[in-house]
């Protein structure tokens, strides 16, 4: 398993704004999608392509296109929806698979309440999106679910991640790569990332 912290001035600038406590809901949504676009660019560098011929303005042209069944994006509800448009802007043909989970605030373990996966998911690469990788429990459970459905190629995109969550995923699924805008310091006693973003779901949906 590899962890890629995307080191880019635009990512750093936008993430810095996301961390501010007074950022408006509309701006938080926009920034989340903007950072997701930049992460998507990095996370898809190794996609396999194939040559094909298309009709150009001056005749046939040989071009390269992504090979195979391509991508399914997997937003973890609800906060993952805040990054969905950003990824679909980059890969508009991606199929969307939805996983609904919430974290039990007493045990900090995930509870699954909804699943709808793309057809032929065993032939696709799944990209899981969620603003925060905290304890890692939700991500491990999502990967378990995808692998049980036959998916073999999985990676995750996150705005921020805690070292504790990264280690948990590494131990459970060493074949899954993670792309993140920043690896933060630690989790607090309640399982929240420090310095983190606060409650990303509330900030995206304007709830408290």
UniProtKB/Swiss-Prot annotation:
Q: Which NCBIfam families match?
A: PRK00129.1 (NF001097), upp (TIGR01091)
HAMAP family (UniProt xref): Upp_B
User: What keywords are annotated for this sequence in UniProt?
Assistant: Allosteric enzyme, Glycosyltransferase, GTP-binding, Magnesium, Nucleotide-binding, Transferase
Residues recorded as binding uracil, renumbered to this chain, are: 193, 198-200
Q: What does this protein do?
A: Catalyzes the conversion of uracil and 5-phospho-alpha-D-ribose 1-diphosphate (PRPP) to UMP and diphosphate.
Q: Does the keyword Transmembrane apply?
A: no
Q: Which residues are noted in the entry as 5-phospho-alpha-D-ribose 1-diphosphate-binding?
A: 78, 103, 130-138, 199
Question: Which processes are annotated in GO (biological process)?
Answer: UMP salvage; uracil salvage
Q: Does the keyword Magnesium apply?
A: yes
- InterPro entries (UniProt xref): PRibTrfase_dom, PRTase-like, Upp_B, UPRTase/APRTase, Ura_phspho_trans
Pathways per UniProt: Pyrimidine metabolism; UMP biosynthesis via salvage pathway; UMP from uracil: step 1/1
Organism listed in the record: Oleidesulfovibrio alaskensis (strain ATCC BAA-1058 / DSM 17464 / G20) (Desulfovibrio alaskensis)
- Which reaction equation describes what this protein catalyses? UMP + diphosphate = 5-phospho-alpha-D-ribose 1-diphosphate + uracil
Which molecular function term from Gene Ontology is one that the record holds? GTP binding
Report the sequence similarity comment from the record.
Belongs to the UPRTase family.
The UniProt note on the cofactor reads as follows:
Binds 1 Mg(2+) ion per subunit. The magnesium is bound as Mg-PRPP.
Activity control, as annotated, is: Allosterically activated by GTP.
Its EC number(s): 2.4.2.9
Q: What is this protein called?
A: Uracil phosphoribosyltransferase
Question: Could you tell me which CDD domains the record lists for this protein?
Answer: PRTases_typeI (cd06223)
Q: Which cofactor does it need?
A: Mg(2+)
